[in-house]
């Protein structure tokens, strides 16, 4: 982890120095995977083993390190880690977190939509009954937002942004700036990552900060890093327009851009048409979700499945459900 910390420190130094030639840097966002990579997913590792040996604690040594960066630059830091929960033995979640300029963790978001079928993380919906009993059944329990001097911040990691509901939940909970990272190639090269991120920003009149991963080493002994993400990091404004873009992915780089919270707030308060959320016909939309689709409490009494088992027991069943309900039409062959 030491060399990774050095690499992150050097990257922040370069990025902050050059970006501050325009305006002061107040927010530093590391992509999902920056601390640990994705080896638990790529190598299909046993969940309990990784929970004990690879996952971290929040707060902990890693967040303390990121806290030193926050204090040094007087900035908020957003990052991600596979992390344990103190009340669930041999389990880990995918957690996005925010650190304030004083080095304190002020928000933790537990990813609610892992990347199926490869991601092994438990999510709140997988232990839904336990989660609701502990944290309640409200927006803050699943899509937390923190109010800061640079705006209201929230987190929507990677595959969470594939579902419009997650961005809308954050927006309805007050979010103004949402972190959305990372997304793998070919979903970057075919523009899926960009289309989704811009749509989430436009639909909800919020900023989306979407740093993607650079190259990384799958094993310690490897000499050739792999670019499996394809670059295309963005900062997107509340009208869905890109205000910062970095297409390069095969290495270590950064993207910078201006986040104008006052302009966002003015647009939300002044616009007559394209400040969409004021017009939500919620009584109608509730009909969409009366019938459950994805099963809750999937991992309340067992560890997450490995890739093959998940495909067989969950993905095939979910596709069959869509056909049986007449929502999807089966292909001719």
Regions found by a protein language model. Give the residues of each.
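Short, acidic Gly/Pro/Ser/Thr-rich loop/turn segments
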Residues: 36, 106, 162-164, 216, ...
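CN hydrolase (nitrilase-like) catalytic-core segments centered on the catalytic cysteine
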Residues: 55-78, 152, 158-256, 332
């Amino acid at each position: 982890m030491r060399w990774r910390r050095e690499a992150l420190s050097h990257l922040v130094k370069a990025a902050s120095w050059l970006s501050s030639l325009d305006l002061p840097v107040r927010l530093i966002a590391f992509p999902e995977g920056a601390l640990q990579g994705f080896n638990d997913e790529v190598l299909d590792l046993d969940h309990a083993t990784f929970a004990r040996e690879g996952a971290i604690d929040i707060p902990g040594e890693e967040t303390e390190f990121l806290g030193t960066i926050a204090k040094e630059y007087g900035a908020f830091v957003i990052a991600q880690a596979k992390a344990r929960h103190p009340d669930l033995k041999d389990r880990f979640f995918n957690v996005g977190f925010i650190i304030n300029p004083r080095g304190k963790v002020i928000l933790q978001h537990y990813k609610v939509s892992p990347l199926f079928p490869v991601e092994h993380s438990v999510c709140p919906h997988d232990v839904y009954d336990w989660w609701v009993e502990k944290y309640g059944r409200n927006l803050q329990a699943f899509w937390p937002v923190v109010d800061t001097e640079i705006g209201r911040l929230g987190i929507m990691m990677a595959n969470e942004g594939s579902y419009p509901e997650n961005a809308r939940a954050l927006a309805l909970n007050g979010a103004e700036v949402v972190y959305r990272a990372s997304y793998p190639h070919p979903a970057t090269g075919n523009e899926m990552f960009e289309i989704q991120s811009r749509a989430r920003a436009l639909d909800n009149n919020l900023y989306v900060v979407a740093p993607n991963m650079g190259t990384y080493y799958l094993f310690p002994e490897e000499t050739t890093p792999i670019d499996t993400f394809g670059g295309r990091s963005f900062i997107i404004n509340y009208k869905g327009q890109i205000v910062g873009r970095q297409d390069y992915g095969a290495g270590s780089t950064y993207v910078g851009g201006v986040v104008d919270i006052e302009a966002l707030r003015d647009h939300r308060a002044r616009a007559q048409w394209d400040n969409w959320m004021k017009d939500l016909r919620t009584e109608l939309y509730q009909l969409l979700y009366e019938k459950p689709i994805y099963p809750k409490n999937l991992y309340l009494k067992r560890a997450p499945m490995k890739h093959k088992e998940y495909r067989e027991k969950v993905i095939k069943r979910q596709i069959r459900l869509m056909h049986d309900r007449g929502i999807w039409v089966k292909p001719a062959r």
